[in-house]
Regions:
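Residue-level preference for the first positions of well-ordered beta-strands
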Residues: 29-33, 125, 156-158
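A short, acidic, amphipathic alpha-helical segment used as a generic capping/interface helix at domain edges
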Residues: 108-120, 147
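Long, charge-dense
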Residues: 63-113
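A short acidic (Asp/Glu
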Residues: 42-48, 74-77, 136-141, 168-172
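Glycine-rich, aromatic-bearing surface loops/beta-hairpins
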Residues: 138-189
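Glycine-rich P-loop/Walker A and Walker A-like loops and their local beta1-loop-alpha1 context
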Residues: 1-56, 60
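Short acidic, S/G/P-rich loop/turn micro-motifs used as interaction or catalytic elements
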Residues: 38-43, 70-71, 101-109, 132-136, ...
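Conserved P-loop NTPase "ATPase switch" module shared by AAA+ and STAND
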Residues: 122-137
């Protein structure tokens, strides 16, 4: 018998392989939010890699985006990674404010959203995982809002996020991190 986790992952696979048009039909955007318990992070990493392999086996071009790696590479490209690490030790509040403006506030679309949108242009499916790194300086809701009009309508984007869903609000570590009503949410119990 499949666990709840595996059943929900199979639903994601079915949607992006067989029912792609269903992903955005109800909400108008091709986004899926797959939530999971933060304690399952290692299992999620393994299962996401397995899902990517399955989709590629079925002739899909998949952009697997490790958000942690993306955040570090953006900070490194800007030449501020070492400063961020130093500032984290000294002044966490200033760090959070600076990271938000560095990664999300760049006019209409921040650097993280730009990188995801760029990869979505050449992919059949995008899977973004290890998104817990965004909290608390950024919200998944803000990121999805920036991507909403900047990604292809026919490319499903799956966001694997360690959170719970409470009345359509994502909750990370028992704090509401924003509301995004348009994504299809495949939540855990």
């Amino acid at each position: 018998m499949l666990s709840d986790f595996q059943t929900r992952l199979e639903e994601v696979e079915r949607l992006v392989r067989e029912d792609r048009e269903e992903v955005g039909k109800r909400a108008g955007v091709p986004f899926i939010v797959f939530t999971y318990d933060p304690a399952d992070e290692i299992e999620v990493d393994e299962e996401v890699r397995s899902l990517i392999e399955k989709l590629e086996y079925h002739d899909q071009t998949v952009a697997g985006i490790d958000m942690r790696d993306l955040v570090f590479s953006v900070l490194e490209e800007r030449g501020i990674l070492e400063n961020v690490i130093d500032l984290e030790r000294r002044d966490r509040d200033q760090l959070l404010s600076g990271l938000k403006s560095s990664l999300l506030d760049d006019g209409e679309m921040g650097q993280l959203a730009s990188a995801i949108a760029s990869q979505a242009e050449n992919a059949d499916t995008v899977i973004v995982y290890r998104m817990g790194i965004l909290y608390p300086f950024a919200s998944a809701s803000t990121l999805m809002g920036q991507l909403e009009t900047n990604t292809p309508d026919d490319t499903p984007i799956v966001f694997c996020y360690p959170a719970t869903v409470d009345d359509q609000s994502l909750r990370f570590l028992d704090e509401s991190e924003g509301t995004y009503y348009r994504a299809r949410v495949i939540g855990h119990e």
